[in-house]
Curated annotation (Swiss-Prot):
Residues 70-324 are extracellular. Superantigen. One of its GO terms (cellular component) is membrane. Glycans are attached at residues 83-84, 93, 97, 135, 150. Residues 1-48 are cytoplasmic. It is found in: Membrane. This protein is coded in the long terminal repeat (LTR). The chain crosses the membrane at residues 49-69. Pfam families: MMTV_SAg (PF01054). This is Protein PR73 5'-endogenous. It is a single-pass type II membrane protein. Keywords: Glycoprotein, Membrane, Signal-anchor, Superantigen, Transmembrane, Transmembrane helix.
Length: 324
């Protein structure tokens, strides 16, 4: 009878203990007089491997063709939808509000190209809208207006021009302009500008900002801000403090900032505050009482005075010692 063991046990058994397969169980494993090619039949021949490779190749080819057909069908559908849609011109002139179709450029032969396809009319109009309405004198905006009016320009020409212009603008940004030039440039845009030490300052609301540093309205003024050392807890139970008028979560402060805000620096405390902290530490160590910060404030309220009187009375009544 064949002894069937789990695979791991079979693997780690000694050869002496491993039962030899006999009779029916050993059929096809070892060459015998009746069946000399038994062991070679178990491994695939070169012919089998070749057939398998051919099948895999054909399957991959079919997948690729299917993908190509799907991409072409999708492209045809999108082009039809663009041609059927009546896209209104972005009022470049008040008198001019025409609908026209830009001729699609030559389509690439295969969808597996590393570069982007030619941009659609919608994309170009969105680009034009963004560039024209941010700044009328923008060279890219002017180029796009010209392009929208002149349909004969090819897409490749237009977009190489746009890239060149953008690179030129980037290079101009990198060159440091003098503060005077910055002031003149910003004054032209109708903002209230003044000259700072290192750069221009723009007035937004009632504060002066360096260009690029404005992050929305100035929320927390010094009167409204939480105490700089203790901070407050928001609705998510996150501790926060204000930094330059903005709410900053305590955990997102750099380590040194957090360390500095743990308590006021010792040198800025008055002698009374220093003695109070020392007394609190002494009580905490020797008397085992909790360091009650609000206790001192509570003592000076009416409720606090009543509570202290009650504590004194109860201590006298029940013979308990009171450490005030």
């Amino acid at each position: 009878m064949l002894l069937v063991l789990p695979r791991l046990q079979q693997k780690w058994l000694n050869s002496r203990e491993c039962p030899t397969l006999r009779r029916e169980a050993a059929k096809g494993l070892f060459p015998t007089k009746d069946d000399p090619s038994a062991c070679t039949r178990m491994s695939p021949s070169d012919k089998d491997i070749l057939i398998l490779c051919c099948k895999l190749g054909i399957a991959l080819l079919c997948l690729g063709l299917l993908g190509e057909v799907a991409v072409r069908a999708r492209r045809a559908l999108t082009l039809d939808s663009f041609n059927n849609s009546s896209v209104q011109d972005y009022n470049l002139n008040n008198s001019e509000n025409s609908t026209f179709l830009l001729g699609q450029g030559p389509q690439p032969t295969s969808s597996y190209k590393p570069h982007r396809l030619c941009p659609s009319e919608i994309e170009i109009r969105m680009l034009a809208k963004n560039y024209i309405f941010t700044n009328k004198t923008n060279p890219i905006g002017r180029l796009l207006i010209m392009m929208l009016r002149n349909e004969s320009l090819s897409f490749s020409t237009i977009f190489t021009q746009i890239q060149r212009l953008e690179m030129g603008i980037e290079n101009r940004k990198r060159r440091s302009t003098s503060v005077e030039e910055q002031v003149q440039g910003l004054r032209a845009s109708g903002l209230e500008v003044k000259r700072g030490k290192r750069s221009t300052l723009v007035k937004i609301g009632d504060r002066w900002w360096q260009p690029g540093t404005y992050r929305g309205p100035y929320i927390y003024r010094p009167t409204d801000a939480p105490l700089p050392y203790t901070g407050r807890y928001d609705l998510n139970f996150d501790r926060w403090v204000t930094v330059n008028g903005y709410k900053v979560l305590y955990r997102s402060l750099p380590f040194r900032e957090r360390l500095a805000r743990a308590r006021p620096p010792w040198c800025v405390l008055t002698q009374e505050e220093k003695d109070d902290i020392k007394q609190q530490v002494h009580d905490y160590i020797y008397l085992g009482t909790g360091m009650n910060v609000w206790g001192k404030i509570f003592h000076y309220t009416k409720e606090g005075a009543v509570a202290r009187q009650l504590e004194h009375i109860s201590a006298d009544t029940f013979g308990m010692s009171y450490n005030g």
